[in-house]
Regions:
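Append "Primarily bacterial transcriptional regulators
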Residues: 29-37, 42, 46, 80-87, ...
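…primarily DNA-binding HTH/wHTH and HhH modules…
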Residues: 94-111
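Conserved catalytic/ATP-binding subdomain
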Residues: 4-7, 26, 40, 75
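Basic, amphipathic alpha-helical hairpins
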Residues: 14-26, 46, 50, 67-76, ...
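Short, Lys/Arg-enriched, Trp-marked, Pro/Gly-tolerant hinge/linker segments that flank
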Residues: 1-11, 19, 33, 48-56, ...
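Terminal helix-turn-helix DNA-binding modules in bacterial transcription factors
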Residues: 48-87, 109-111
């Protein structure tokens, strides 16, 4: 069971990610800074309440948002990569395929 304080913390983290998603500077350090804590404290807090590290949480959020954009828009894959703040196309394809088992184009066609 998640405590209210932990839920509020994760809501704050998610809001920061949404606000900065298109920036390739979105990293745990940025989140920690915006929350007024150091990066080690952010990692400790995540370890206490999540199975993911802050870095993995950001990556997972980016991939989920990209998947949503593939289904709900006609944006090109390149435009989606830009919108989710990833600057390396091959990295995006590798991570997307690892998470969903198909390429972004295949994912779009399947939906």
């Amino acid at each position: 069971m998640i405590h209210q304080e932990d839920k509020e913390f994760m809501d704050s983290v998610t809001a920061i990610i949404k606000e900065n998603l298109a920036q390739d500077t979105l990293r745990p350090e940025l989140i920690a800074d915006k929350l007024g804590m150091n990066t080690r404290a952010l990692y400790r807090r995540f370890k206490k309440i999540s199975l993911l590290t802050p870095s993995d949480f950001i990556k997972d959020y980016r991939m989920m948002h990209a998947a949503r954009l593939l289904v709900t828009t006609n944006l090109s894959v390149q435009e989606i990569i830009y919108q989710v703040g990833i600057s390396n196309k091959s990295y995006f394809y590798r991570e997307f395929s690892a998470k969903y088992g198909v390429t972004p184009g295949e994912y779009r066609r399947m939906q």
